[in-house]
Every structure is written in structure tokens, then in C-alpha cells.
Amino acid sequence: MPEKHKRKHLTSFQMIILGFAGVILLGALLLMLPVSSAERVVTPFDQALFTSTSAVCVTGLVVQDTGSYWSGFGQAVILLLIQTGGLGVVTVAVSVFMLSGRKISLMQRSTMQDAISAPKVGGIVRLTKFILRGTFLIEGIGAVLLLPVFCRDFGIKGIWMSIFHSISAFCNAGFDILGTADNTFVSLSGYAGNFWLNIVIMLLIIIGGIGFLTWDDVYTNKLRFKRYRMQSKIILLTTAILIFVPAIFFFVCDFGQVSIGKRTLLSLFQSVTTRTAGFNTADLSSMTEVGQAIMILLMLMGGSPSSTAGGMKTTTVAVLLLNAFATFRSREDAGAFGRRFDSQVIKNAATIAMLYFVLFFFGGITISVYEGLSLQLCLYEAASAVGTVGLTLGITPGLHILSRLILIVLMYLGRVGGLTLIYAVVSRRNTNAKMPLEKITVG
């Protein structure tokens, strides 16, 4: 009898990348509707697709000013896409299943585990509920804290402003609705000296960017740092370093024309927002080349695993640096806090870093050649896209369709993650066979 072919099922990684793609397409179709634009016109598909991708991938790059071009309905669609992208498509889907009272299957639990990089399947439903409660609680508190600022400036409309910017900040999206027909793409530049708003936005960005698993660790163990998992310790320490060290460079190299207090605030805000969020309170095009180069590096590094942020992740950077330090000291194993890294983790980190740098350079160089723009400008936009940051030196709205498509691909790949993409495309096969060993000289 002929052997029957086994029915092939989508892997959890394939479901993740297809889920993101499906939400992006649905968002683009909704944004094309006349009701989505302030002028009640049909938005071209390429512009709607770019905006939807940027929202779902929590990036913040735009070709139309969010505050002046889109209607209230359009802004609500964008905010819903940001929330979906920030939580993750799989998290939202599992949440819908739970709210409907349906039982979560083992396959769905496994997909959720891969989506948020959870260490085990057990307890995944509890963790999902914790993520949802924590997300809405923090976003709600953020909105309340922003009310005094926006209601003072916009009256009753300030309520919507507070909700939108709280969610956008927590999800590390960088979208703002402060632009007007006469003053577009302003971001938070009008609040550069507002201490309260800057602090609230920075805290929302940091909390959203450290990851759901780190929240769970902190919530469970409170301030007992020694009890945290090694990953949580690395994330918190690396995040602190990547906030304060770049802030010192920004303070020294840029913003010299303002007072010490405002200069400190600008430097801190720029350091926090550059890795993940994409808000800006300063004129980025006027920053020094050193400042812009530091920003490119920060954008590529991104946030932390299982967070609302993109990029190659803080843990990837930490693992590579610690492995290099171990090599310099002629140590067999790399690790931190009395624990060593598995060799596969180091391989994964190197693969992710290589993938992001290839995408970054390929995207930037291609746009530069096609548009005839300087390489530094285009590398900046490419880093912003693949790191899902959203900062721009002002060239994105004027790019041709091909260059926009490149940025769309970079944003998408930057959000779904390097390993997710690799595992979705390449089948993983276990084999005990090994090739003969031969040494090769490197360096």
C-alpha cells in the first residue's frame, strides 16, 4: 500500500510571522478607508501599508503626520494596531480565547511560549493574564499622569492625547498626534523642557522595554535582586548601562546651547528613546555626527526579549560582550552572576547580530544608491526601521515607493525577530552525525 503523506501543520514560529503579516494587511485596508483620513479621502495603499506596518511593528516611522492627516477613527485604528503589536499578535489571540471561555490548547500554549520567549509551557496562561493586567494597569496610570499636561494645553481633547501617548510610549511605538496642518512631524519637541512629561514618558518606555518576563521576576521576588533569574539581572544591568553611558556622551557632544538642567533632561530622554521608542524632544538633524553615530548603535541594540520593543535585544549585546571578555581572559565558558551561558545561546546571539547588521547595511546602502542621498542619512533610517525605533532625520516622507518597501521589510523583520524568522523558514532537524574537525585561523 502506498505510504500516506503526513499532514503538515504550521509551526509556532510560522504562525507568529503570518499573524503579524495578517494584522498588518488588515490595518492597511482599514487605513485606506475615507473615514480614516481627516480629509475623508482614500489613502493610497502604499502609504496605508507603511503606516500599518510601522504601527504593528511599534516603530513610529511615518509618511503622513499622524496628528493632522488621520481622523479620530484613523488614529484609533493606529492605536489598536500599536497595542496589538506591542503585546504581540499571539498574546492578543490567546487573550481573546481566554475571554471567550474556550480552553487553550497545548499547541496554543507552545506558540505563546515561543512568542514571548518563556522558559517553559507550564504557567503560560497565568503569565498571559499577568501580562495583560500589567499592561493595562501601567498604561492607565501613565494616561492619568499625562492628563495634567495635555488637558492644560488641549482641554477635553487632552484625555485622548493622554491615552494615545501613554500606550504609544509603553509599547515603544513613538507615534504622536501633536502635529497640525501648519506644524507637522513635531513629536514631543514642544515639551522638551517639561520635566513631568519627560519623566512619565521615559518611565513608560523603560517599563515596556525591559520585557514581560522581567516584570514577572520583579513582581515575584520584589527588590531581592539576588533571587532574580540571570536573564533578568542581565537585562536590568544592561538597560541601566545603555541609558546612562550614552546620556553622558549626548551631554558632552550635543545640546550645548541650553541650560545645564535642560541639557541633562534632553540627554537622558534621547538616550532612553533612541534604543526603542522613537519620540524626540530635540532637533535630531542638528545633532553632531558623533551623536548620530551613537544613536545608530543604540537603535540596532533595541530593547529586551519578550518586551514591546524590537532590535537585536539587550541580552544579545550582553552575551556577545561577555563571551568576548571570556575569550580575552582565556576562559572556557562565558557567563554572568555565577552562571554560564549555553553554547547554543552564544551561537544564537552571533547569528542575530549578524542578521541585523546585514539587514541594516543592505537596506541603508540600497536606499542611498536608489535615492541619491548620503549614506549616513540612509543608514540612520535603516537602523531606525530594523531596530523598530522610528527616529528620522526627515527623509522618510519623501522616499520613493521602492525605498519605503525596503523600510517596510526592515520594520517587519525587526519586530518578528531574527530567530523567529530563521526557525520559521528553516526546518530544525536533530542529527547525531558530525563532520570531521579541522582548525581554521581567524583574526
Mark where each language-model region is.
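Membrane-proximal intracellular helices of multi-pass ion channels
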Residues: 1-443
